Amino acid sequence: MEKIDLNEYLASNEYPGRGIAVAKAPDGRQMFIGYFIMGRSENSRNRVFDPVPERGGICTMAADPAKLEDPSLIIYNPVLTLGRTHIVTNGDQTDTIYDLMSQGKSFADALRTRTFEPDGPNYTPRISAVVYADGSYQMSILKSADGNGDSVQRYFFDYPQPVAGEGHFISTYKHNGSPIPSFEGEPLRFACPRTLGDFAHGLWSSLNADNKVSLFARVIDLESGESGDMIFNKYDAVCSDLDDPEEPELLPEELELLKKLDEEEE
């Protein structure tokens, strides 16, 4: 499969829906994870990503709770961390994977208990990925048989030896439509940029301006296991900690400067 420019691909696609990108940095020492959501209806657009640090992930929440019409299928945990295993999905199957892997089951075992979303006639696919401590990863899509709500098709993709500077992308939809056609084929292979900033900003700026809602990006250091996150939200949250972040502690030099200013005022 030929490598694509993922940013160009997304820029030319009005509505890929929700998407997962996993890649190994060009230096081979880091893994990148990206997950975005889009929306066409007011209910789908009324969302933000909010950190859930105690579970090593994020949740979706209503930007304005007063405008929330139907929480099913749009309020869930897209990202959770189990030890040094990072789980990302487009629905509540994140918790299914987390719970069953906690019991010693596999990624595939967990997803064999699930099917596509019950939102006919679209029957939105469930897309999922898991990144392991050594940088290997797996992806999956659970979709209907060409819109047949009585038939599920489960696809799994293993990447045990990821190549530095490359990644794979999968989305719920092929493109916009009515009903919306599901993603087809294996995950798309793409060239990975050098830094998480380039990766995240490239994805966010490439998504359709009208339909994009939120983006999450994570970098994982393969040696230490430490990770760092970036979150982009198009809409402001109402009554959320996102509106009032904690002020970081002042550096010693900043404290010294304030002390001098106070002395001058006296």
Language-model features: locations:
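Conserved short alpha-helical segments that host acidic/polar catalytic motifs at enzyme active sites
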Residues: 1-266
